[in-house]
């Protein structure tokens, strides 16, 4: 297997949307979209904002500017119960969630970005539950390898070991840390992908560009 590899969209697993049960596939809306030459299905927004529960959660904490900062996002996600039986997301995880989708560099998140995050979180949660076969509420090294593979990424054993050491506690990765890993993996891959003009797994960029792209996550 060649390294490195790139995942597409949120991975090859179903995305939960309001009105659908966890695990129910999203109806097909057309062929898979190739993202800048990288394989994998692209995410598409499959529901409207008007009157749905996602908007209710968001608007309950959003400021007058219609956006949320990290503390407001943390409160919103906790109140929504999206984490299920797992511990609520930490403030640091909420910060990098915002950074992942902060395309206008405001340090906040509007509703469209929140919908995108909501879909990603449900997909990552389903993926976590799929690989947590013993129901321990954590994933181990081999389960994380499976989860990352399901998302379409092809990582070297050395990189996977580095990720496990970074996000695990006594060899086990809890849901909040797992989501933080997914956020960073997606954000850094997107950052690199935009600069890999030939789509060959290599890119050149200046030091300041590198710092701007990585220090925000």
From Swiss-Prot:
Assigned keywords, A-Z: Calcium, Cytoplasm, Membrane, Metal-binding, Repeat
GO BP, one annotated term: membrane fusion
Tissue: Detected in neutrophils and macrophages (at protein level). Highly expressed in bone marrow.
PROSITE patterns: EF_HAND_1, EF_HAND_2
Stretches assigned to the EF-hand domain: 48-83, 89-122, 119-154, 155-180
Membrane topology qualifier: Peripheral membrane protein
Any Gene Ontology CC annotation: plasma membrane
Signal peptide: none
Gene Ontology MF annotations: calcium ion binding; protein heterodimerization activity; protein homodimerization activity
Record-listed Ca(2+) 2 binding positions: 132, 134, 136, 138, 143
Domain of life, per lineage: Eukaryota
Subcellular location: Cytoplasm; Cytoplasmic granule membrane
Main location: cytoplasm
Binding site for Ca(2+) 1: 65, 69, 71
Protein task: Calcium-binding protein that may play a role in the adhesion of neutrophils to fibronectin. May play a role in the formation of focal adhesions.
Miscellaneous notes: This protein has been shown to bind calcium with high affinity.
Subunit: Homodimer. Interacts with SRI and LCP1.
Identification of the protein by name: Grancalcin
Species of origin: Homo sapiens (Human)
Higher taxonomy: Eukaryota, Metazoa, Chordata, Craniata, Vertebrata
Name of the encoding gene: GCA
